[in-house]
Amino acid sequence: MESTLGAGIAMAEALQNQLPWLENVWLWVTFLGDPKSLFLFYFPAAYYASRRVGIAVLWISLITEWLNLVFKWFLFGDRPFWWVHESGYYSQAPAQVHQFPSSCETGPGSPSGHCMITGAALWPIMTAVSSQMATRAHSRWVRVIPSLAYCTFLLAVGLSRVFLLAHFPHQVLAGLITGAVLGWLMTPQVPMERELSFYGLTSLALLLGASLIYWTLFTLGLDLSWSINLASKWCERPEWVHLDSRPFASLSRDSGAALGLGIALHSPCYAQVRRAHLGYGQKLVCLVLAMGLLGPLNWLGYPPQISLFYIFNFLKYTLWPCLVLALVPWLVHMFSAQEAPPIRSS
């Protein structure tokens, strides 16, 4: 295993030193492959293009992120940015590698969350675009473009994670395979407009299930804060260690989004726009308005106390689906209805 990890460091060193002009590209790719970007960009864009696909993206994101958290607790994967110090690799073969603000994530490293969660959540988008192109394009090469774009993007995300010293190549590969399999399995099974209690119980099950696993492992003598301690110890700058990279931050996000999805689907605003037909221009306005609201909400400051941070994160992502599914379309629909000229009866 040591040789495999050493080869991963060598690969990161090659990416950083042989292709330094690609640094900004890798930073952008890892940002676009971040699970938080699924909530901020891909979910709203997919929803306003297709209601079914948008809900699938959100649902698969929150379930897969929860599974990724549990997998990481059991697999205990090191991250390159601390392993090079803890293992003594530097003293044996000094590597010319350096960290970035995105390197210092505090959870275990295996499997890669960027690859697993994003790969699963983008699967319904890829399959929807593929089916559309299959009905309109006669060329076989044109029909495979969505699949090629999906694979190319995820490969780039994986390389960016190696470049940043956030993951080893085998962790990236595990995330890519697991994400694709989960996306394939879950896309046909996404619940659409179930009763509110279903989403409330899902949110509760995510919280209680992860907490039960955590305390069971803790009772058995496993210290699940080991990765937080190592990240804090070996990160070059303390300000690069962010609260929102902690394992329970993703749990609060997922449980909040599950509850928010149920609230949105059963809100009066959603009931009014559910049967309404929004034109392409209205959908574009919805997307712009949603991004204008979600952006500031995403970049709000966090409470310094860890418990308050988790509560704040839960409430923020509960509000997220309510804005995208209900409030924004309702506002656009209401203003469009007011501006429409009255129909004169003959």
UniProtKB/Swiss-Prot annotation:
The gene is G6PC3. One of its GO terms (cellular component) is endoplasmic reticulum membrane. Belongs to the glucose-6-phosphatase family. It comes from the Eukaryota. It is a multi-pass membrane protein. Hydrolyzes glucose-6-phosphate to glucose in the endoplasmic reticulum. May form with the glucose-6-phosphate transporter (SLC37A4/G6PT) a ubiquitously expressed complex responsible for glucose production through glycogenolysis and gluconeogenesis. Probably required for normal neutrophil function. GO terms for molecular function: glucose-6-phosphatase activity. Residues 46-54, 130-140, 187-197, 274-283, 329-346 are cytoplasmic. SUPFAM superfamilies: Acid phosphatase/Vanadium-dependent haloperoxidase. It is found in: Endoplasmic reticulum membrane. The chain crosses the membrane at residues 25-45, 55-75, 109-129, 141-162, 168-186, 198-218, 255-273, 284-304, 308-328. InterPro entries: Glucose-6-phosphatase, P_Acid_Pase_2/haloperoxi_sf, P_Acid_Pase_2/haloperoxidase. Residues 1-24, 76-108, 163-167, 219-254, 305-307 are lumenal. The active site is at residues 114, 167. It is an enzyme of class 3 (hydrolase). Its EC number is 3.1.3.9. Its main location: endoplasmic reticulum. Keywords: Endoplasmic reticulum, Gluconeogenesis, Hydrolase, Membrane, Transmembrane, Transmembrane helix. Inhibited by vanadate. It catalyses: D-glucose 6-phosphate + H2O = D-glucose + phosphate. It comes from Bos taurus. One of its GO terms (biological process) is glucose-6-phosphate transport. Substrate binds at residues 79, 161. This is Glucose-6-phosphatase 3. Pathway: Carbohydrate biosynthesis; gluconeogenesis. It holds the Pfam family PAP2.
